């Protein structure tokens, strides 16, 4: 479990005012606090200077992490940028930083807290910045799934592999049951390792990354994969289906990458002759199969860096990153467009805006610890074990 605190540095935590995150009515999906004090107005013309001044006052005591999907107004203040795992490791490599301000979403801040020292404090500028995919697998649901696998007589054959985009509770479950974490960059290595440990894999929470890696990279068939729906009795599967499957995929997905369709690919090819279609592996299987290139955010960036001048690219990932890359490479004559005609930001990632960042930095500069993300020791122990197994992958 994770706690979120907003406190004076020298006093006890004040009561938390909960915010409902997303559309779920389940109270377990509630997370976040209202910002105590005055949140700066988005129209404040001094926001940039206020952020710069607060960061300068904090000096080496603060280390700001910016995920690739963040707004430009926020990313300009990041000391480093990257995907979730890279940023968590970067934070752990800066032990002199007392405060880690994570401009990302909740599960990322949890991972940073797990990998950093006890003396470091991880802050999320807006605690309502969650991840719909991470919230699609709760600890209770996954425990129930394991009971279903046990009743089917296959639990001992199953190795859990959890995507980095999961809660600390799910990472801890994975660690307790002998599994590992994976990223979109090393999912193949994680699956290869898992199949050396057991006959089957429970992959969660992103069905698409699991399916794409198993079929595209591992040579499994679609028939080797079954979809476990936590909202149906026994996951909507028979014991025979579970026993026959090699990949048990959790019914979760990324709300952004799940929007891209085969029609999106066909349309962009018709509009832009010679375009290269490059998508993230969180996209649907048919989209990945129709793309020219598939890879993580880091892969996408490197592919565009290496692309020749005059090349044309349609990118299937979050719009903030695509826009930033289009602007960056336009002077080199590289045409970069968003794969879908419908604008699609990550709404929860976009909750981290400049006013929230200014509020967090100014609060820390004034001696007030706000929005701290803290994973409890028991959860941290097993989540870290799962992360360490990933770090040990060849």
Which residues does each PLM region occupy?
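Active-site loop-to-helix "anion-binding N-cap" substructures in soluble metabolic enzymes
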Residues: 2-316, 320-394
